[in-house]
């Protein structure tokens, strides 16, 4: 997608899955990786530990040529697509691998235009042909605070991340088996990925989407100093993320290379969800305790009465000793984004799941 005439924006993403052990971070990510491996797409996949020089050398050897049919002609492109995956982010970003150097390299490659050149002690000058890096990683909530201590790194590196959080399992089954429908879905996904991999060209806005984009874009704040550094890094790229997610939504919908208003709505919605997750990452342990107290109060309501609808004023009375109105609104927004509740006017609708 051409952006303001200065550079092309590609829908590569850096995604960080954060949650406690057992919620399915690595398992769900691995399923997607394995499905991608079963396609014929020319995507280089590197998993877990690697040093910056080794990553540079791996990418320099991983350039691929791909043929596309475009406008009745055959177009041959040369680029370096890479999926870097870490089932535990601590295995990838460690003192042994050079956490600062690797985060700085990934930061630079996030929106790289054209070729990338660097120098290593072993091979000297290295050139990577049009790198396009997608990064998936999983970690515990405590890892960010304990290991990624540099605020400058957190602002630059995490500012390029879409953060997805989970606090509990959504499904429980004593015996998980693939059903015939699951097997068929897997085949359909592989087939769709093959079609997506053959797409070539530039995405365009539909008239309605372009109008929506302009309105939303000009509504975004210009001053990033009011937020902490972690969220300011994300906020400065909020528009980029909305575009990238809208493109990916459009790809999942069809092959016309047109971004519709619905595609953009989905992209903006996901940006808001991830931004709220990043804000929660900066919360103190005391703030997390308050969130859990509100969640527990809502759960208690539902266990005592059959109705899952709760009046906002009644909840405010119960929590007024340790949460003012503004703080409660922030907490309810977080719980709504997690899917635990739905707020309609002054009514809170509990959706669960409920923890014992």
Predicted feature descriptions by range:
Residues 1-356:
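Phosphate-handling catalytic cores of nucleic-acid transaction enzymes
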